Structures are given as structure tokens and as C-alpha cells.
Amino acid sequence: MPTKAKVAIVGSGNISTDLLYKLLRSDWLEPRWMVGIDPQSEGLARARKLGLETTHEGVDWLLAQPEKPDLVFEATSAYVHRDAAPKYEAAGIRAIDLTPAAVGPAVIPPANLRQHLDAPNVNMITCGGQATIPIVFAVSRVVEVPYAEIVASVASVSAGPGTRANIDEFTKTTSRGVETIGGAKRGKAIIILNPADPPMIMRDTIFCAIPEDADRDAIAQSIHDVVKEVQTYVPGYRLLNEPQFDEPSLNSGGQAVVTTFVEVEGAGDYLPPYAGNLDIMTAAATKVGEEIAKETLATTAGGAQ
């Protein structure tokens, strides 16, 4: 019986390379292939040195191989994944999508991972979503949250051309996730590209409107519990200080507010530690892949008995 799921990484850029190092440490995932389109790609060269089979001939090469992966992690672009996703599904390959394509349901591990373990395709939403939606979820599971607003500040040098070209998509997708996964009735997302040099690590502020008579101790405890859960796969995720509670005011629209400040320091596997915004995407994707693999391997083992 196999003890690890066979994995292909589609894409050979910075995120794919950082993801590779995380997958190599996994007890549940075995990276076997890296697929790119540039024969001179540094990511493909690194993957070859680490023992993976590589190609610059794209997804069609992977799908033509006699042995197929169980899981594909795709870190290319939205239009590439939208084209490839039906091919993966037809081949019986599960897909974890790190692009904005959103073909399948969006997943935030502490909030809704268990609901989508059998989905053929899951989407990792955005870096801002992975960092902030867990906090909104932590509050909304204790009290009603009529409005939540998140502000994600990331080092400008960590934002590549894809992020810059899709700022509007980032804010819309993250805002929607604050509502549909975080549990807020209305959500808003803002991203700031911080030009500071030396670069600052990712910092996020999460505002949640709450009832005036809310149990503040229960909310604070729920936030701490979720932070600990995120730290199991992103050790550099931490609260900057205790959640801050404010009474209703004109500035808050007459509602009480809890404000949470977090920062995300990357593990430094391939990307620099200040790029916590990218690290949390690869770490969360690895976590999702591991849980899918555990579930799949357990089901396979049960069926074999």
C-alpha cells in the first residue's frame, strides 16, 4: 500500500520552487514531477538536482505519461489553470490551485478544509485571505459579525507582475472569502504594497464589528485558538498583540469592534523570510494537500481490507 501521494508541481517560478521544498519535507506527499514551459527555468534546474523528473513541455506532457500523479499543485496563472483543470479531472488527478482561477471551492484550512477533502479541485484564494480570513472565522464562530474589513500590507518586492496586474481581483476575491468562509455578513479587503527597504514582513489588520454585549473573553480565546492552528503549518504566523476591543463610536458606524493585528514571517525555504505573503500560500497549499492525501490513502486502505 502506498504511504505517500504522488505529486506534480505545475509551474516552475518562485512559488513553485518554495512549494517544492515544503513538499520534500512532507510525510504524506512525494513530489515526483515539475512541469514548466521555459527550458532555462531555475526552478526546473533545482527540481532536477533534487531528483524530480522535469519538463518544459507543459501539462500535456504530464498527462501523456504512463504514470500519473495523484495530486497536482498548480502555480501558473488563472487562464492556464482554467484550461488545464478539466484535463486533470478527466485523468482522475486532484488539483490544488494557487492561481486566481477559482475553478473549485476556496479553502482556508482552519475554517473549511474538512468540507472539501473530496473536491476534485480546490483553490487557495489569496495570500491576504489565507492570513486574515482565519481571524474573521474565529470571531464569527462566537458572535455575529455584520461587517469585517482586512488590510494586508506586503513587501512591494515580494509582489510579482501577476499580483500587480490582479490587484482588483485580489480585493474582490478576498472580500468574498471574508463573507463566504470567514462568516461576515459583509466583507472588505485592502492590499498595500509596502515599498520600505529593507523589506518589511507581511502585516495584516483585521477589523470585525461585533455586538456591544459580546463575550470578549470568548472571542479572544477563539482568536488565540485559531492562531495556534495556523501556526501548525505556518510557524511564522503570530499575533502582534492582544485583540483590541473598542466601544461603539461614530467611526465604527455605531458598532463595537474587535481589531486583531497579525504578522507572517516566511520559513525562508526558497523565498526570503519577509515574503510571508507567498510563504503562507505554499504552506497552506501543502497543508491542504497533506489532508487530502491522508483522507485518500485511508480510504484506499479501507477499501483494500
Swiss-Prot record:
Catalytic function, reaction form: acetaldehyde + NAD(+) + CoA = acetyl-CoA + NADH + H(+)
Source taxon at top rank: Bacteria
GO biological process, one term: catabolic process
Example of a GO MF term: acetaldehyde dehydrogenase (acetylating) activity
Uppermost EC category: oxidoreductase
Binding-site residues, NAD(+): 12-15, 158-166, 277
Keywords from the named record: Aromatic hydrocarbons catabolism, NAD, Oxidoreductase
Active-site residues annotated for this sequence: 127
Listed EC numbers: 1.2.1.10
Family membership: Belongs to the acetaldehyde dehydrogenase family.
Annotated protein name in UniProt: Acetaldehyde dehydrogenase
